[in-house]
């Protein structure tokens, strides 16, 4: 019995969130999938109970000193858990918003890159391409002796190299050092004769001491070494050698420094920190290792060129400033234009000189406002070369110590590629070091797959191969893990903050596989999100490999392929929120398929399904044509999106879907509809936008950054609720207005916690602890406000209701029930009205935004762009969502989705499949048309998987 217990994780009485006293035995060392409707309690069981308790027990085992760095987790609401081992959660959250954090740094691949470049990289002079290397005396001697016996060798000590001057003192010093002969400008002289040459002081000269002439043979090593040592000593470490072997004349430069012997370019010590853009030792000094700098541009400081200077066209040079007036009066006089001339009418050449400066001296006269008002002559006269408006503003920005001024300037600046390092982040010295012709940033500019190919085919000599063997092993294994989790398309220099939650999670997963731990409980949150079916197979293989290492892998997942691969399934339900929190079925796949209570099982068995539509809308209502899309990996493609139909953009991960829709199409349409073309880039032209009147982008960004933001405030019906409470007789008798029922303003809120509902307690040896406010007991409002009740419920009680409960409670209040209806339609009946925005997933935030848009009055000419709306949705929730989206289209609107879910794709009226692969191998339109046409395309991965469903 004791042995069998150790093979299970035993959970008894789990009551966290909506869990209803759940008891479950989970087999260890297997792939366990927890399924169920959105809000049914999957994450509450996996993350908030099992992982939380495993983590908490580990934390308790370390010292108080260590705990202050590790953090402390509260005990989950569960009676008993046994069989736990150390647990690791791999969640869907952005890794870091730090611009210095990249895919290469977070996977530690870049650390190994720095190491291999420091060990076997070869430095080349940036000026002449010559190999730079430190050479010892013995190495120089051996190199010269390697030439054929009998070769004539002349050793020169370079003293002056291409410098102006008569160099009299240099020649005198050479004489005093005891040398007899010199070579000056390619001519040989006795030192006495050289002193009488009277070299022209304004011309460049080269002076070398002729140290020795040697004929190579058996007994010359000692003499050669002594002469070389002398040459290096008098020339500060440089030596030039002429070798004549009768067949050819060879000219070689040697140096004992890490510098170019020809131009003198000096390189610091080659070590790993030289290649770190986070270290002042290796970072570009201009951009401090960011690769970009903040710069002013003409469009930002002069948004309306139809205005003149006197109309205050320039936001940073107003007529109210005497200095600005002085500058522009001087410029106008010098370049012959009027201060009332619209900026757009100033000649381009003149405008360029005004913006960027010139070498011409310009006369300026500064007059105070008092002198100008009295039309007095005089003032401060000065003449100088004008640096240009943009450099002047940059200088002011760098010089100011005023925080408000800095913020004002930064709002007018934009990020530009660093002019010094060209976006490579590193110093010139670091970029001179190369392996097979590539510097370290050239390698980070490659995709994960291309990087793997580069190192797999890397040819090295015997010495370098031995030095780099272990480093290469680590690099290739990490790259292979990333490929195995479907991230072959990512570039190693990609900023980690730009990764989706799914990509970030799979990077963590790849890192964990690389660590090769065993005996661990891994808890993952929908790792298949954002993955094409082709890549999903790789991901599942990775999860199985993680299990085979001797770990327990618990996955919260809706993906059918993952469910069918699982060793054990726990299906939560039967509904969401208060209607969920129970285990409706558990066991192997066959047990779930045979369960009458399992909604998941009924979809997997085919009893319930999302049908292929009997007919599809025809694309005959016009189109929007986006021509020449070329941003990121897009290959100058022409995109045609039919209006009035349901379109899905498909393609493998990294094929360019998000770039095309979110970074090119949306800004293009948004700017055209708002008559503002400033933000348009990445395409040549857009046609047909006149046929729509509004564009709405519904993404997965949070609906708010603080605990005060919630679904009720975002969608807008909290205002209606507050006004309803303010109209109650009790509220009127107390003189309460609608503002009394807001936790954001003084009056009705609890002032001890300022409407947060909790207090932040600072601990000395522990992290900050958030505890419910002891005055309002976490209710956010003061006692007087809570005494006002509607149908027996106060404002706090209402905010604690789920959307489903609230819909029943407010069914006779149309202004409120109208909004709640749409939240239910998008599958959010389980969330609370006052649930903090910080606790909502990306998918939940997106569906709240969708509900908000649905609640508005439709014009029938709206263009919707929605990015993967099925994120976090069960089969049944997807069915509901599709009904909503199809209704939007039936009302005359256009809906365009980015989606991988095949149930959604098969319902589309029109598909545009990008690819054929990810990264550089993507960016093309592989096929477009109705699903049946896409399924026939042999080059389409989407078509390959779609074929079986039609």
UniProtKB/Swiss-Prot annotation:
Listed GO biological process terms: nucleotide-excision repair; SOS response
Work out whether the entry's keyword set contains Zinc-finger: yes
Sorted alphabetically, the keyword list is: ATP-binding, Cytoplasm, DNA damage, DNA excision, DNA repair, DNA-binding, Excision nuclease, Metal-binding, Nucleotide-binding, Repeat, SOS response, Zinc, Zinc-finger
| Molecular function terms, GO-annotated | ATP binding; ATP hydrolysis activity; DNA binding; excinuclease ABC activity; zinc ion binding
Identify the stretch annotated as signal peptide in this record: none
* Pfam families registered for this protein in UniProt: UvrA_DNA-bind, UvrA_inter
Its Gene Ontology cellular component terms are: cytoplasm; excinuclease repair complex
- Tell me the InterPro entries matching this sequence: ABC_transporter-like_ATP-bd, ABC_transporter-like_CS, ATP_grasp_subdomain_1, P-loop_NTPase, UvrA, UvrA_DNA-bd, UvrA_inter
- Domain of life, per lineage: Bacteria
Residues the entry annotates as binding ATP: 36-43, 651-658
All copies of domain ABC transporter, residue ranges: 317-599, 619-947
User: Chief subcellular site?
Assistant: cytoplasm
| Keyword hit for Protein transport | no
Biotech use, in short, is: One of 8 loci used for multilocus sequence typing (MLST) in Borrelia burgdorferi.
PROSITE patterns named among the record's database cross-references = ABC_TRANSPORTER_1, ABC_TRANSPORTER_2
Q: Where in the cell is it found?
A: Cytoplasm
Q: Where are the zinc fingers (C4-type)?
A: 260-287, 750-776
| Similarity comment: family membership | Belongs to the ABC transporter superfamily. UvrA family.
Q: What does the record note on quaternary structure? A: Forms a heterotetramer with UvrB during the search for lesions.
Function, as annotated, reads: The UvrABC repair system catalyzes the recognition and processing of DNA lesions. UvrA is an ATPase and a DNA-binding protein. A damage recognition complex composed of 2 UvrA and 2 UvrB subunits scans DNA for abnormalities. When the presence of a lesion has been verified by UvrB, the UvrA molecules dissociate.
Entry's PANTHER family?
UVRABC SYSTEM PROTEIN A
What's the protein here called? UvrABC system protein A
Q: Which gene encodes it?
A: uvrA
């Amino acid at each position: 019995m004791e042995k069998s217990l150790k093979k299970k994780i035993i959970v008894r009485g789990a009551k966290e969130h909506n869990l209803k006293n759940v008891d479950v035995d989970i087999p260890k060392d297997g792939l366990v999938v927890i399924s169920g409707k959105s809000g049914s309690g999957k994450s509450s069981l996996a993350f908030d109970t099992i992982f939380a308790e495993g983590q908490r027990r580990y934390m308790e085992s370390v010292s108080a000193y260590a705990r202050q760095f590790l953090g402390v987790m509260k005990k989950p609401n569960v009676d008993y858990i046994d069989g736990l081992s150390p647990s690791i959660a791999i969640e869907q959250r952005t890794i870091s918003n730090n611009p210095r954090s990249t895919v290469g740094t977070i996977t530690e691949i870049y650390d190994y890159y720095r190491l291999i470049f420091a060990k076997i990289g070869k430095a080349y002079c940036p000026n002449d391409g010559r190999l730079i290397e430190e050479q010892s005396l013995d190495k120089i001697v051996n190199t010269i002796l390697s030439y054929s016996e009998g070769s004539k060798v002349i050793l020169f000590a370079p003293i002056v190299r291409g410098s102006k001057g008569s160099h009299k003192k240099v020649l005198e010093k050479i004489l005093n050092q005891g040398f007899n002969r010199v070579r000056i400008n390619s001519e040989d002289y006795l030192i006495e004769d050289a002193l009488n040459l009277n070299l022209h002081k304004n011309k460049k000269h080269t002076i070398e001491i002729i140290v020795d002439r040697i004929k190579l043979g058996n007994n010359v090593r000692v003499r050669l070494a002594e002469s070389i040592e002398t040459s290096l000593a008098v020339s500060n470490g440089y030596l030039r050698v002429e070798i004549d072997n009768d067949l050819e004349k060879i000219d070689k430069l040697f140096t004992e420094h890490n510098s170019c012997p020809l131009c003198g370019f000096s390189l610091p010590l080659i070590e790993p920190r030289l290649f770190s853009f986070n270290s002042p030792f290796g970072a570009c000094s201009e951009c401090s290792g960011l690769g970009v700098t903040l710069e002013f541009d003409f469009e930002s400081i002069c948004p309306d060129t139809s205005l003149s200077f006197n109309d205050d066209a320039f936001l940073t040079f107003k007529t109210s400033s005497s200095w600005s007036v002085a500058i522009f009066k001087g410029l106008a006089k010098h370049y012959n234009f009027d201060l009332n001339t619209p900026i757009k009418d100033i000649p381009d050449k003149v405008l360029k000189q005004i913006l960027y400066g010139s070498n011409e001296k310009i006369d300026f006269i500064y007059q105070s406002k008092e002198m100008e008002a009295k039309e007095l002559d005089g003032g401060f006269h000065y003449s100088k070369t004008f640096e240009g408006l943009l450099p002047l503003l940059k200088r002011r920005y760098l010089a100011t110590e005023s925080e408000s001024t800095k913020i004002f300037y930064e709002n007018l600046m934009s990020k530009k590629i660093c002019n010094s390092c060209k976006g490579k982040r590193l110093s010139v010295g670091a970029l001179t070091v190369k392996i097979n012709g590539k510097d370290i940033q050239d390698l980070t500019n490659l995709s994960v797959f291309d990087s793997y190919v580069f190192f797999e085919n890397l040819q090295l000599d015997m010495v370098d191969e031995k030095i780099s063997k272990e480093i290469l092993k680590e690099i290739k294994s990490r790259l292979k893990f990333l490929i195995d989790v479907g991230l072959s398309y990512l570039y190693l220099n990609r900023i980690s903050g730009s990764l989706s939650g799914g990509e970030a999670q799979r990077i963590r997963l790849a890192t964990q596989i690389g660590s090769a731990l065993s005996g661990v409980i891994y808890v993952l949150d929908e790792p298949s999100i954002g993955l094409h079916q082709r890549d999903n197979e790789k991901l599942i293989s990775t999860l199985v490999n993680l299990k085979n290492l001797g770990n327990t892998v618990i996955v919260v997942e809706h993906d059918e392929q993952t469910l069918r691969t699982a060793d054990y399934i726990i299906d939560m339900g039967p509904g969401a929120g208060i209607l969920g929190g129970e285990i409706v079925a558990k066991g192997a796949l066959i047990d779930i398929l045979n369960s009458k209570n399992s909604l998941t099982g009924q979809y997997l068995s085919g009893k319930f399904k999302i049908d292929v539509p009997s007919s599809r809308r025809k694309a005959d209502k016009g189109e929007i044509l986006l021509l020449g899309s070329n941003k990121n990996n897009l290959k100058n493609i022409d995109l045609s999106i039919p209006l009035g139909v349901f379109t899905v953009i498909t393609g493998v991960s990294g094929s360019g879907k998000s770039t095309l829709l979110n970074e090119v199409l949306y800004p293009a349409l948004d700017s055209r509809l708002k008559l503002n073309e400033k933000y348009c880039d990445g395409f040549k032209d857009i046609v047909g936008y006149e046929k729509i009147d509004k564009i709405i982008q519904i993404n997965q960004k949070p609906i708010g950054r603080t605990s005060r933001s919630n679904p009720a405030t975002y969608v807008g019906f909290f205002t209606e609720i507050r006004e309803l409470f303010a109209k109650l007789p009790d509220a009127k008798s107390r003189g309460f207005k609608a503002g009394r029922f807001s936790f954001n303003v003084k009056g009705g809120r609890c002032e001890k916690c300022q409407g947060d509902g909790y207090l932040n307690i600072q601990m000395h040896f522990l992290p900050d602890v958030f505890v419910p406010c002891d005055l309002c007991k976490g209710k956010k409002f003061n006692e007087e406000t809570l005494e006002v009740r509607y149908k027996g419920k106060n404002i706090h009680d209402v905010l604690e209701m789920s959307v489903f409960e609230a819909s029943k409670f407010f069914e006779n209040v149309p202004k409120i029930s109208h909004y709640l209806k749409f939240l239910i339609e998008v599958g959010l009946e389980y969330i609370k009205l006052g649930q903090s925005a910080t606790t909502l997933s990306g998918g939940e935030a997106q569906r709240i935004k969708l509900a908000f848009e649905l609640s508005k009055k439709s014009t029938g000419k709206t263009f919707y762009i929605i990015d993967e709306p099925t994120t976090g949705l069960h089969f049944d929730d997807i069915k509901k969502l599709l009904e909503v989206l199809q209704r939007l289209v039936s009302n005359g609107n256009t809906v365009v989705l980015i989606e991988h879910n095949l149930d959604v794709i098969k319902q589309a009226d029109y598909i545009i499949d990008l690819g054929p692969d990810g990264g550089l191998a993507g960016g093309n339109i592989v096929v477009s048309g109705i699903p049946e046409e896409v399924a026939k395309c042999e080059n389409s991965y989407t078509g390959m998987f779609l074929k079986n469903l039609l």
